[in-house]
Amino acid sequence: MLFRSALWQYTQDLKNQFLRNAPPINKVMYDNKIHVLKNALGLHTAVSRVQGGKLKAKAEIRVATVFRNAPEPFLRMIVVHELAHLKEKEHNKAFYQLCCHMEPQYHQLEFDTRLWLTQLSLGQDKI
């Protein structure tokens, strides 16, 4: 179970290990408004604002709150996915290659995570 500050540090550690040249992340948080079965598992946003005549971009990563109690490999898969969007905006071949570079078991973990979420939706909370 990672709390907000631990989630930020966890994400920063992965970013520093694999994406040192990517833009900085300004905010990482759990978001209870993300409905994981109908929509996304996490969200990434780039917010642009004008400050003092300059355009400033801020990157944010939001992870569905359900992952606060998820097995760590499932959380890692979500964080890797959202970090990959810092470099690749679309879900294309380069995006998935980057995900697999950061987490070699990415595809298996994505599959297992979706099975776990389906199990939760059926009211079964044991893995």
Regions found by a protein language model. Name each.
Residues 82:
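Walker B catalytic acidic pair
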Residues 1-76, 86-127:
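Active-site-proximal or metal-binding-adjacent scaffold patches in catalytic folds
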Residues 79:
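Walker B beta-strand of ABC/ABC-like P-loop ATPase nucleotide-binding domains
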